[in-house]
């Protein structure tokens, strides 16, 4: 059986029997075991990274939002959980939230962990497919695995994973269009699905415009072809406006970023020491090195994609994965050129082999998720009895990142804030930050929100200030959190 799997998987490279036998055509023919080995390595690595307890601070409010959509079928309006919010809560990620909530309601947290792993396998597959538009199986799998590692800082159980998968598909589609100049009309309905899942859908439109602009600079487009290709991003924007949220969806990325850029770390400029940024920039550097050493001029559309990848990587931590995904087929193309051969087309047999391996990995991941993800990781589950005993509607002064978990774990309580920064005024967030850091006037926020309890990090400055200056007492501690009670 292993022999058949090896033969089938090797077919991903699209190498015909004739090419395999003729060393003059293929002087660097890959060993028969290499493609299967790389495929298994990439898939096993992905499963290893994907199966772990649920821990992301955003996961909890995403689950709560999924339940809200299923019960009320509303997509915007006043926030239903935190009375201190002052802006509408627009549900731009409702589709994966609903899927995750349905999985959780049946199988518990292991379903959420498994969905994360399955999405990562889908991302790997989409990266391989995109890279195969530019290279044979060996360089494609290598570039795809590098791209997956570049996204590593954002591979959590959040709807953005859907964005990464659809972005990789979009990049691969436009790479194919750059080769044959045919519009991929299916990108418009794909964008509709994307816009129901996450706010990065606009990056897909940007990729299309970037490739079209590059092709125009390469003088490969006549007016008719250019008009057809431009119709794809135009229709994609129109499709995004047709989601249940409506046309206001087109403006939500700007509304979110206006608040988040100041207060949320992942929206701030990339740290030069970020390991995932280093991986992504390394991918781009290897590509550029190959271009510099090469003898042929690079097409403008590839140069434009490389520039876009650099900008996305350096713009903010949140978009490092975008740069990594864009860079994957560029790296694959550069590696293919080092082989001195034209890339061979992907075959149905190779596709079936890959899909079979990924499906087997996803099935095998299910019982592992059930074993390791029964309880949340890094959250104060040990304080649930004390929290449950607090009277309903009591206001809790919470750690910024713990707001979502508190809403999900103890919905009868009222947190003062959570990570959905777009629903709060900037003045309110600044006032919270002043209190969190115990700066001058910090007690004014307490007068405004009137909390009777606090759920904070054990060593936070605010924890010490509440104890020492206002005589708050400790109710319990767990997982680096402390529950305090006002006198």
Give each language-model segment a name.
Residues 390-429, 447, 451-459, 484:
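Short periplasmic/luminal acceptor-recognition loop of GT-C membrane glycosyltransferases, typified by
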Residues 127-149:
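Transmembrane-helix signature of polytopic, membrane-embedded enzymes
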Residues 147-151, 173, 183-199, 209, ...:
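Membrane-interface alpha helices of multi-pass inner-membrane proteins
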Residues 140, 144, 176-192, 226-231, ...:
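Short hydrophobic alpha-helices at membrane interfaces in multi-pass membrane enzymes
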């Amino acid at each position: 059986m292993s022999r058949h799997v090896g033969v089938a998987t090797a077919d991903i490279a699209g190498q015909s029997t004739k090419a395999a036998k003729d060393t003059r055509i293929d002087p660097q023919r890959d060993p028969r075991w290499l493609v299967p080995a790389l495929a298994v390595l990439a898939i096993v690595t992905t499963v290893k990274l994907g199966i772990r307890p649920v821990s992301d601070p955003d996961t909890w409010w995403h689950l709560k939002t999924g339940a809200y959509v299923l019960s009320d079928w509303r997509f915007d309006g006043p926030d239903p959980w935190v009375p201190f919010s002052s802006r509408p809560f627009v549900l731009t990620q409702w589709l994966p939230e609903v899927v995750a909530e349905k999985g959780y309601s049946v199988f518990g947290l292991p379903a959420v962990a498994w969905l994360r792993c399955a999405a990562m396998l889908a991302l790997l597959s989409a990266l391989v497919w995109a890279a195969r538009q530019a290279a044979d199986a060996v360089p494609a799998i290598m570039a795809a695995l590098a791209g997956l590692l570049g996204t590593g800082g954002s591979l959590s159980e959040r709807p953005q994973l859907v964005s990464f998968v659809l972005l990789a598909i979009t990049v691969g589609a436009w790479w194919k269009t750059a080769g044959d100049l045919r519009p991929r009309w299916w990108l418009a309905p794909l964008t509709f699905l994307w816009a129901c899942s996450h706010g990065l859908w606009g990056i897909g439109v940007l990729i299309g415009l970037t490739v079209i602009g590059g092709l125009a600079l390469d003088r490969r487009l006549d007016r008719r072809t250019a008009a057809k290709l431009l119709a794809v991003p135009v229709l994609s924007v129109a499709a995004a406006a047709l989601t249940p949220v409506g046309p206001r969806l087109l403006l939500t990325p700007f509304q979110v970023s206006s608040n988040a850029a100041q207060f949320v770390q992942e929206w701030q400029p990339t740290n030069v020491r970020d390991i995932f940024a280093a991986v992504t920039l390394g991918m781009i550097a290897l590509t550029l090195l190959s271009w510099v050493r090469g003898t042929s001029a690079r097409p403008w559309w590839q140069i434009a994609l490389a520039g876009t990848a650099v900008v996305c990587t350096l713009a903010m931590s949140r978009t490092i994965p975008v740069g990594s995904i864009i860079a994957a087929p560029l790296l694959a193309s550069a590696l293919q050129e080092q082989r001195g051969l034209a890339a061979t087309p992907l075959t149905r047999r190779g596709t079936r082999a890959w899909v079979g391996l990924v499906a087997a990995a996803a099935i095998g991941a299910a019982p592992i998720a059930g074993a390791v993800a029964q309880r949340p990781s890094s959250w104060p589950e040990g304080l649930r009895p004390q929290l449950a005993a607090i009277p309903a509607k009591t206001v809790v002064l919470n750690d910024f990142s713990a707001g979502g978990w508190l809403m999900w774990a103890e919905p009868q309580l009222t947190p003062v804030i959570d990570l959905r920064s777009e629903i709060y005024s900037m003045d309110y967030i600044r006032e919270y930050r002043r209190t969190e850091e115990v700066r001058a006037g910090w007690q004014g926020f307490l007068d405004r929100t009137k909390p009777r309890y606090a759920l904070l990090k054990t060593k936070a400055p605010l924890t010490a200030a509440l104890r020492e200056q206002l005589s708050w007492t400790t109710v319990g501690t767990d997982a680096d959190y402390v529950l305090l009670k006002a006198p």
